[in-house]
Structures are given as C-alpha cells and as structure tokens.
Amino acid sequence: MGIFSKLFGKAADTICAPVAGEAVEIQQVSDPTFGQEILGKGIAIKPSEGRVVAPCDGTVDMMFDTGHAVSLVADFGAEILIHVGLDTVNLKGKHYHVYAKNGDKVKKGDLLMEFDPEAIRAEGYDIITPVIVCNSGDYTVFQPHVGKTVKTGDEVITLSK
C-alpha cells in the first residue's frame, strides 16, 4: 500500500510523460495561458524526441486538425491537454503526423502523433510541451514530478481526489 492510499484511502492516479525530455515546472512556459495555469495545473517537457504517446489509459477527446495538440479524458476522469510547442498552431500541421483520432480508446504508451523537433525549431518555434490537467481543480492532491529527464511512460503527475 502506497503513501497516498494510506493517507486518502485509495490509490492515487498517475499521468505519465507523453514525450521524452526534461520535465520542468509549468511556470517555465513563456506563454501565460500555460505558465500562469489559466487552463489548469500541469508540467512541461522540453522534448528530446518527436513522439507523443498516451500518458494513461483513456479516450482521445480532441485531436487538433493541425496535429500540434491533443486532449484526452483519462479513464480515471482527468482531462489532459498535451500541446506540442508554443504558437505551433501557426504551422497548420506542417512537421506533424497524427495517428489517433477523436473518440479513439487508447492505452498508456499508444502512439498519438509524431513531430519533427528540429524542423519546428528551425522555423523559430519553441517546442516546450505543456501537459495540462484542465480539471485540476477537481483534485485535492496535485503533485508534479519535475526537475529530471524522463522517458515516455515515466510518472510526471500524481493526482488524488
């Protein structure tokens, strides 16, 4: 039995890294929509590769046509937004390849999209990737795990109601 289940009577829910790289505090994101937690609490990852995978089991709620972002609803209820880069909607899908579509049931680790980090950077965009829990206010415990290098599937957020 883990510490969360001892304290709160049930196991905590976890969100894993959807992309490999350096996990950092959300406040390091220069876009205030993310950095000031307007959309919800979260973390950001400075990607070291161009693959985005499902951070938990759930359903694809919205795969943006431009491929720069995806929102999922976790089986445990968290509403998760993964936004690859800042202002990358302006690329209109260039340098992104989408594998998942709206309504798809996904398992942790399933490939959602790929992107070309070098090409996006070369066009002048920051590829920092916010991972936001849009309904973070529904949780009494929100524990980010940042300040480390992560690979896809590593735990980056712990939640408990």
Question: Each predicted region: which residue ranges?
Answer:
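Contiguous, well-folded functional domains in the mature portion of proteins
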Residues: 2-161
